[in-house]
Amino acid sequence: MSEASNTLSNMLTHADIRLLEFEDTHPRRTGLKNDAILHRLGMSPARYYQRLDQLVRQQAVQDRWPRLADRIGRQNERRRQERAQLQRWL
C-alpha cells in the first residue's frame, strides 16, 4: 500500500471507503441502487447521500476520487440552483 493510500485509510473509516467505492461504480440513482445501499452498506439511502456529501468535501477524498468528487459537487450545485429558482417563484 502506498503512503498516500495508507494516509487516506487512516483518515477514513472502512465504511467510508466502501461507500465511496460503491458510489464510484454505481453513479446513477435508481431503485435498484437504493436496494443495494440498504443491503450492501446497511444504511438508508438518505443517510448514504448525506454521508457521501460530507465525504466529497474532504480534500483527501477529492485527491483520491477526483471525478467522483467533481460529479457530486456538480450535482449538488445544480440542485442548489434549482431550489433557488423555485424560491423565486414562491
Walk through the language-model features, giving the residues of each.
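Amphipathic, hydrophobic secondary-structure cores in small proteins
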Residues: R18-R74
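Short, Lys/Arg-enriched anionic-surface-contact patches
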Residues: E3-R18
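Intrinsic-disorder signal
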Residues: M1-A4, L90
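Intrinsically disordered, low-complexity basic tails/linkers immediately adjacent to helix-turn-helix/homeobox/MYB/SANT
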Residues: R67-L90
